[in-house]
Amino acid sequence: MKLLLLALPMLVLLPQVIPAYSGEKKCWNRSGHCRKQCKDGEAVKDTCKNLRACCVPSNEDHRQVPTTSPTPLSDSTPGSIDDILTVRFTTDYFEVSSKKDMVEESEAGWGTQTSLPDVHHSS
């Protein structure tokens, strides 16, 4: 049991001490490593995640090969005519007025010439 308790911290600290065990990510077409700082004889070619630099050995000419090729369009035949659709937007609007506005208009002479009937309230 004591041996297990001693081995566990060693396995946890081992990746931080030995770079080969740290699981550094490969970058730049698998020819470089993501590190905080590049070693002597390495050049920074790109940036990796977590603000790390992609360190590539500087004595070789490394060119990154694109991993994907352009995808051709399925309907890209020469001479095809594209349909153009024009949509015109129309706005429908309504005027809202109250009875008070109608009374004021009729008094000003702009509305109809009929007067409103008198209303008598009985109690």
Curated annotation (Swiss-Prot):
Primary subcellular site in the record, as a coarse category:
secreted
Q: Where is the signal peptide?
A: 1-19
Cellular component aspect of the GO annotation: extracellular region
Stretch list, region Disordered: 59-79, 102-123
Disulphides: C27-C54, C34-C48, C38-C55
UniProt xrefs under PANTHER family: BETA-DEFENSIN 123-RELATED, DEFENSIN BETA 118
Q: Which family does it belong to?
A: Belongs to the beta-defensin family.
In Swiss-Prot or TrEMBL terms, this protein is called Defensin beta 118
